[in-house]
Design a protein with these regions (language model features):
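Membrane-interface helix termini and inter-helical loops of multi-pass transporters
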Residues: 27-35, 91-94, 140-153, 201-220, ...
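Hydrophobic transmembrane alpha-helices of multi-pass small-molecule transport proteins
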Residues: 53, 75, 115, 124-144, ...
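Glycine-/small-residue-enriched transmembrane alpha-helix faces in small-molecule transporters
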Residues: 1-43, 91, 147-174, 195
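Hydrophobic/aromatic residues within transmembrane alpha-helices
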Residues: 32, 41, 45, 92, ...
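Helix-helix packing/entry segments at the starts of transmembrane helices
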Residues: 42-44, 82, 86, 100-107, ...
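Specific transmembrane alpha-helical segments of multi-pass solute transporters/efflux pumps
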Residues: 20-21, 25-26, 54-105, 141, ...
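Transmembrane alpha-helices of multi-pass small-molecule transport proteins
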Residues: 11, 35-84, 111-115, 164-171, ...
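C-terminal transmembrane-helix exit sites in multi-pass transporters
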Residues: 52-65, 89, 108-130, 256-276
Length: 295
């Protein structure tokens, strides 16, 4: 049987698998915070992912340390993806349902694009900024409506999670261009693992393992195995096979998929406001990414 070059169809397949894996993060975190603290979830994700990363690097034969000049980018990628995003997300989901988080985090493509613009000096057209403003306004309206007329602390945590994720994607994209997505992710997790091990052990001392619900364990393991590692591996492979411009659009479906999982798995109510705002954000993010100028 001859080897076949990956096609754009492979890119779509892996991209969809990655997106679906990411979309379960909100539900998994919402369930896990019932028995685990945000610190335990965040540090535990890193420890689990680091074990998988070490195995992956050995299998791929990528055990040689990256060049020193790439370390700042790898560490920045890890800090945003493995610490900032999950920690702030867990803090938020202690207070609001996963549906709320799904709508707000729908702004992730805009956050990523804006950070990339600031980092690269791009000059996007007016349509880019208008689309971002519309998406932000829709999320702001939803958050104020859900908060009874005002923003909540959870909304602040969610916006910090967005900034962390956007920063991680931008920095990760820079180092992934040289190392490859899976290799970059693996080294980022390994570099952070020693710093995550102690907080993880310490945070678990307050957990009564015998009373932890199976659903909390499932959410905790999902966050480490799927959200932190496998989904990223599928996603980066999809980008490599199908191209960033084409496959990257698949992630726009993530908040809509997260809404669906929230209703199906948690039984959360999806209000008309949530659906309308999610659709507006989705449309705005499509325009945002389509109008962005690449340099």
């Amino acid at each position: 049987m001859s080897n076949r070059e990956p096609s754009w169809r492979d890119g779509v397949l892996f991209g969809v698998l990655g997106m679906l894996g990411f979309s379960g993060t909100l539900v998994a975190t919402r369930v896990a915070v019932h028995d685990f603290s945000p610190l335990a979830i965040t540090s535990g994700r890193i420890v689990i992912a680091a074990v998988l990363a070490a195995m992956t690097l050995v299998i791929l034969g990528k055990t040689k340390l990256p060049e020193r000049r790439l370390l700042p980018g790898l560490i920045s990628m890890g800090l945003g993806l493995a610490i900032g995003y999950p920690f702030f997300l867990a803090l938020a989901l202690e207070q609001v349902p996963a549906v709320h988080g799904a709508v707000v985090t729908g702004l992730a493509p805009a956050a990523t694009a804006i950070i990339a613009v600031l980092r690269t000096g791009e000059r996007p057209p007016l349509g880019f900024w208008i689309a971002c403003a519309i998406g932000f306004s829709a999320v702001l309206f939803f958050a104020i409506d859900a908060g009874g007329g005002h923003l909540s602390l959870a909304d602040g945590w969610l916006f910090l999670a967005l900034l962390s994720l956007g920063w991680a994607y931008v920095e990760g994209g820079r180092v992934s261009a040289e190392l490859g997505g899976t290799t970059a992710l693996s080294w980022a997790m390994l570099f952070l693992a020693p710093f995550a091990a102690v907080p993880f052990v310490w945070s678990m001392t307050d957990v009564s393992l015998a009373t932890v619900a199976w659903s909390s364990w499932a959410g905790f393991v999902y966050a480490g195995v799927v959200s932190m590692f496998l989904a990223s591996v599928f996603w980066y492979r999809g980008l490599a096979a199908g191209g960033i411009a084409r496959i990257g659009q698949i992630n726009l479906l993530l908040p809509l998929a997260a809404l669906l999982w929230s209703a199906l798995l948690l039984g959360e109510e999806i209000t008309t406001t949530a659906v309308v705002c999610a659709v507006v954000v989705f449309a705005a993010m499509v325009v945002c990414l389509k109008s962005r100028v690449r340099t």
